[in-house]
Swiss-Prot record:
Name assigned to this protein: Small ribosomal subunit protein uS17
Gene: rpsQ
Keyword Metal-binding among record annotations: no
Record's keyword terms, sorted: Ribonucleoprotein, Ribosomal protein, RNA-binding, rRNA-binding
PROSITE patterns: RIBOSOMAL_S17
GO-annotated biological processes: translation
Stored Pfam families: Ribosomal_S17 (PF00366)
PANTHER family the UniProt entry points to: 40S RIBOSOMAL PROTEIN S11 FAMILY MEMBER, SMALL RIBOSOMAL SUBUNIT PROTEIN US17M
Any one cellular-component term (Gene Ontology): cytosolic small ribosomal subunit
InterPro entries found in the cross-reference section: NA-bd_OB-fold, Ribosomal_uS17, Ribosomal_uS17_bact/chlr, Ribosomal_uS17_CS
Superkingdom in the source lineage: Bacteria
Function: One of the primary rRNA binding proteins, it binds specifically to the 5'-end of 16S ribosomal RNA.
SUPFAM superfamilies: Nucleic acid-binding proteins
UniProt-listed NCBIfam families: PRK05610.1, uS17_bact
Length: 88
């Protein structure tokens, strides 16, 4: 019997800080359509994500997945590193 977890959100972003132990800050860019003017606007969101083995460095493109609360600010965890050292 395998436990199926609910739909977990996944995002792709770039690591902008790795100065904390087992934690990275990931910047995620989204294009959102303005409801009135119908113009696409770039929105940036930053997440603190758990990096258990401290493998991520600044500039890495990573995939993060939603998880249970790990601390006051951490609700995401690094799933995999997609590219190393992407230029910001």
């Amino acid at each position: 019997m395998s436990k199926i977890r609910g739909n977990r959100k996944t995002r792709v972003g770039v690591v902008i800080s790795d100065k904390m132990d087992k934690t990275v800050v990931v910047k995620v860019d989204q294009m959102v359509k303005h409801p009135i003017y119908k113009k696409y606007i770039k929105r940036r969101v930053t997440f603190k994500a758990h990096d258990e083995e401290n493998r991520c460095n600044v500039g890495d493109k990573v995939s993060v997945v939603e998880t249970r609360p790990l601390s006051r600010d951490k609700r995401w965890r690094v799933r995999e590193i997609l590219e190393k050292n992407v230029i910001l």
